[in-house]
Design a protein with these regions (language model features):
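N-terminal amphipathic alpha-helix/helix-capping segment at the start of soluble metabolic enzymes
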Residues: 1-21
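Hydrophobic faces of well-ordered beta-strands that scaffold small-molecule active sites
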Residues: 7-13, 42, 61-65, 94-96, ...
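A short, N-terminal amphipathic alpha-helix
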Residues: 32-38
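Short, acidic/turn-prone active-site loops that include or flank metal/cofactor-
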Residues: 66-70
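Active-site-adjacent beta->alpha loops and helix N-cap segments on the catalytic face
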Residues: 20-24, 43-62, 73-80, 98-116, ...
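Short, structured coil segments at secondary-structure junctions
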Residues: 57, 89-90, 119
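Conserved, mostly hydrophobic/aromatic
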Residues: 34, 53, 86, 136
Length: 137
C-alpha cells in the first residue's frame, strides 16, 4: 500500500459520535467524494465507517480506532482489541499512537506492530516528536 500512496493525497474521513457528520453513510459518501477528487487513500475510524467506505471506494484504507482507557492517554488504536477490530474489516494499513506514553493494560507498541505485521498488514506511526519518529521506524 505504501507505494500506492507515497507522495499522494490521503484524505481522512472521520467523525465521532458527538460530531455533526457522524454516520457510516456520510463517511461512505465523503470517501466517494475523496475518490472523485483524486485521493489515493482514505484514513478512517471504526469498523462501521470502514465497512461503509469499502462499499463506496476501492481505495486503500488506513484504519484507526479511537477509544479511551482509564489507565492511559493513548487514544488512537491503543490495544490489541482495536487492532483485531481493524484486521476483521480488512484494512490495508493500521495507524497507531507511537508516542512515548504508557499504553492501556501495559501493552507494548513493539508487540502490537509485530502482531500487525504477522497478519500481513502495514503499520503507520502517529508521533509527536522527531525522536518518536526515529523510535517508530
Amino acid at each position: 500500500m505504501l507505494n500506492e500512496v507515497k507522495g499522494k493525497l490521503i484524505i481522512s474521513c472521520q467523525a465521532l459520535p458527538d460530531e455533526p457528520l457522524h454516520s457510516p453513510f456520510i463517511m461512505g459518501r465523503m470517501a466517494l467524494a475523496a475518490t472523485m477528487a483524486g485521493a489515493s487513500g482514505i484514513r478512517a475510524q471504526g469498523m462501521a465507517d470502514i465497512l461503509e467506505i469499502k462499499q463506496n471506494t476501492k481505495l486503500p484504507i488506513i484504519g484507526i480506532v479511537k477509544r479511551n482507557y482509564d489507565d492511559s492517554e493513548i487514544y488512537i488504536t491503543p490495544t490489541k482489541k482495536e487492532v483485531d477490530e481493524l484486521l476483521a474489516v480488512g484494512v490495508e494499513m493500521i495507524a497507531l499512537d507511537a508516542t512515548n506514553r504508557p499504553r492501556p493494560n501495559g501493552e507494548k507498541i513493539e508487540d502490537l506492530v509485530a502482531y500487525i505485521k504477522s497478519k500481513g498488514v502495514e503499520t503507520m506511526a502517529d508521533c509527536s516528536t522527531i525522536e518518536e519518529c526515529y523510535e517508530a521506524e
